Curated annotation (Swiss-Prot):
This is Aspartate carbamoyltransferase catalytic subunit. Catalyzes the condensation of carbamoyl phosphate and aspartate to form carbamoyl aspartate and inorganic phosphate, the committed step in the de novo pyrimidine nucleotide biosynthesis pathway. The keyword Transmembrane does not apply. It is an enzyme of class 2 (transferase). The gene is pyrB. It catalyses: carbamoyl phosphate + L-aspartate = N-carbamoyl-L-aspartate + phosphate + H(+). Heterododecamer (2C3:3R2) of six catalytic PyrB chains organized as two trimers (C3), and six regulatory PyrI chains organized as three dimers (R2). Carbamoyl phosphate binds at residues 55-56, 105, 135, 138, 271-272. The keyword Transferase applies.
C-alpha cells in the first residue's frame, strides 16, 4: 500500500484484497471478550473532522482504540477553525503534537490530498470523506460486506468480486460514496450500474468505468447487490426532481421491487437512511438489508487500514485467537 489513503482509485487489486483479508483478521477481535490488540500502542491517531459525522468518526475512533493507539478527536466546531484558523496551521499544530496518522473529513474536495502532499505533517493521511469527491474507507467496507455475503467470510480470503453485478441508486451527483465504490468495485472485477434521475447524474459520467440506467426496474433482476443512496439536500441549491413522492415512486426501493431481485441479492445503504424516501421500512428492516453489518464491518476495515498504513506489529495480529465457538 501507499503511505496515504486518499482515493479508492489509488488502490490496485492486490492492495484492495490485502485490506479485505486483513479486515477478516481484525473481525476476529470483535468476537473476543476483550476487543483489543497492542499492535499500535504508543501511536497517535487524530480524527480531524470539519463536517458532522456519526458512523465514520465513531468507527475510526473505535478502530484506533482497538489497536491500542492514542486517539485525539478534533471537531471544527468549538476549535480555532471556527475563529478562522487555516488547514495549514491546524496541520502544523497536529504535527507538533506528534500525530502518526490524521483521519480527515472536510467539505472541500481535495483537502485530504492537500494535507498529504503539502509537507505540513509527516504522518499518514486517511480520507474520511472530502466534499463530493471520495470516501475510500466506505467503499472498502461496502466491498468487504459484499464479499462476505456473496462469496463467504471463510471462502472469500484472497478473492475479489469478479463477475458480480452491483447497482448503485440515488443521488450520484453529490455522492462521494458512489465515486469511491465505482473505482474500487471495478478494480475488484465487479460490473457497476448507476441508476438515478438525469438531473442527479454527474457531467462526464460516460467516462466512468460503469453503466448508467434511468430505470431501477430494468436492472433489479440482474443485480447481486443494490446500494441505495440518500438524496443530499444539504448540497443542493435547486430542485433536482419534482417532489419527494415522485422520486420515491421511481427510484425508491420497496418490498415489491425487492421481490424482483435474485434470492441471493442484498440491499445496502451507507447511511444515514431516509426511510420512506429512497428505502421503505420493510426493506430496511429485512434480512436482506446489510446496513447494521456495514457499520460493524466499518470498524474492521478501518482497523485494517490503520494497521497497514502505520506498520502495526505482525506478532500482535497473529496472536489474535481464531474464531471458535468458545470465543464467539
Amino acid at each position: 500500500m501507499k503511505r496515504h489513503l486518499i482515493s479508492a482509485a489509488d488502490l490496485t487489486r492486490d492492495d484492495a484484497v490485502l485490506i479485505l483479508d486483513t479486515a477478516e483478521e481484525m473481525a476476529r477481535v470483535a468476537d473476543r471478550p476483550i476487543k483489543k490488540l497492542p499492535t499500535l500502542r504508543g501511536r497517535t491517531v487524530v480524527n480531524l473532522f470539519f463536517e458532522d459525522s456519526t458512523r465514520t468518526r465513531i468507527s475510526f475512533e473505535a478502530a484506533a482504540k482497538r489497536l491500542s493507539a492514542d486517539v485525539i478527536n478534533f471537531s471544527a466546531k468549538g476549535s480555532s477553525v471556527s475563529k478562522g484558523e487555516s488547514l495549514k496551521d491546524t496541520a502544523l499544530t497536529l504535527e507538533a503534537m506528534g500525530a502518526d496518522a490524521v483521519v480527515i473529513r472536510h467539505g472541500a474536495s481535495g483537502a485530504p490530498y492537500r494535507l498529504a502532499t503539502s509537507g505540513w505533517i509527516d504522518g499518514a493521511v486517511v480520507n474520511a470523506g472530502d466534499g463530493t469527491h471520495e470516501h475510500p474507507t466506505q467503499a472498502l467496507l461496502d466491498a468487504f460486506t459484499m464479499r462476505r455475503r456473496l462469496v463467504g467470510a471463510d471462502t472469500g480470503l484472497g478473492r475479489d468480486l469478479d463477475g458480480r453485478r452491483i447497482t448503485i441508486v440515488g443521488d450520484i451527483l453529490h455522492s462521494r460514496v458512489a465515486r469511491s465504490n465505482v473505482h474500487l468495485l471495478t478494480t475488484l472485477g465487479a460490473h457497476v450500474t448507476l441508476v438515478a434521475p438525469p438531473t442527479l447524474v454527474p457531467v462526464g459520467v460516460e467516462k466512468w468505468p460503469c453503466d448508467v440506467s434511468y430505470s431501477l426496474d430494468d436492472v433489479l433482476a440482474k443485480s447481486d447487490a443494490v446500494m441505495m443512496l440518500r438524496v443530499q439536500r444539504e448540497r443542493m441549491n435547486a430542485a433536482y426532481f419534482p417532489t419527494e413522492r415522485e422520486y420515491s415512486r421511481r427510484y425508491g426501493l420497496d418490498g415489491e421491487r425487492m421481490a424482483k431481485m435474485p434470492e441471493h441479492a442484498i440491499v445496502m445503504h451507507p447511511g444515514p437512511m431516509v426511510r420512506g424516501m429512497e428505502i421503505t421500512a420493510e426493506v430496511a428492516d429485512s434480512d436482506r438489508c446489510t446496513v447494521v453489518e456495514q457499520v460493524a464491518n466499518g470498524v474492521s476495515i478501518r482497523m485494517a487500514v490503520l494497521y497497514l498504513l502505520l506498520g502495526g506489529s505482525d506478532t500482535a495480529l497473529s496472536a489474535a485467537p481464531a474464531r471458535t465457538e468458545e470465543n464467539k
